[in-house]
Design a protein with these regions (language model features):
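N-terminal beta1-alpha1-beta2 submodule of the flavodoxin-like/Rossmannoid cofactor-binding fold
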Residues: 1-78, 88-90, 95, 99, ...
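Short, conserved loop/helix-junction motifs that constitute active-site signature segments
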Residues: 73, 99-105, 129-130
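Glycine-rich, N-terminal phosphate-binding loop of Rossmann-like dinucleotide-binding domains
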Residues: 83-84
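Acidic catalytic loop of the alpha/beta-hydrolase fold
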Residues: 87-88, 116
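Short, glycine-/small-residue-rich phosphate/pyrophosphate-handling segment
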Residues: 109-146
Length: 159
């Protein structure tokens, strides 16, 4: 049986809730991807062209710094990476996370939360950050998703 990690970034707490439920449902370790400089409410105002999140998402090379690295990443074979959908893709801090480790031979499975967007071009944007890893198609969940639905999703992945 492979060792699993649920790593997640959550700006508002919604993705954190889904990540915690997923980790419990599949018996995985959990790790919060925290930005070195926390996002403020103003930073997250997607309607403001000068907001930090808008600037980051409009720059494909943007890599926001992460506060803490996971020391034992080499111990994991399967990594579920959770995030809110921003501009129809993963926030660029997810690229920072993936590029911070040697992912060779690992299986990466994105999962996301959104108020109405689907997974969009998330995998297309994440693939260059997953060198040497197997990147599976991601899925968007509502904040109300339960253990049973998450466990069934993971079972369906046939890991």
């Amino acid at each position: 049986m492979s060792k699993k990690l649920v790593a997640y970034f959550s700006a508002s707490g919604v993705t954190a809730k889904v990540a915690e439920t997923l980790a419990e449902a599949i018996g995985a370790d959990i790790f919060e991807i925290e930005p070195k400089v926390p996002y403020t409410e103003a930073d997250l105002n997607w309607m403001d062209k000068k907001a930090r999140s808008t600037i980051e998402m409009n720059d494909p090379a943007s890599r926001p710094e992460i506060a803490i690295k996971r020391d034992n990443m080499k111990d994991y074979d399967t990594i579920f990476v959770g995030f809110p959908i921003w501009w129809y893709v993963a926030p660029t801090i997810i690229n920072t996370f993936l590029e911070s480790y040697d992912m060779t031979g690992k299986t990466i499975i994105p999962f996301a939360t959104s108020g109405g967007s689907d997974i969009g071009k998330t995998n297309e944007r994440l693939a260059p950050s997953c060198k040497g890893a197997k990147l599976l198609e991601g899925k968007v969940f509502k904040s109300s998703v339960g253990h049973k639905e998450l466990a069934a999703w993971v079972d369906g992945l046939k890991l």
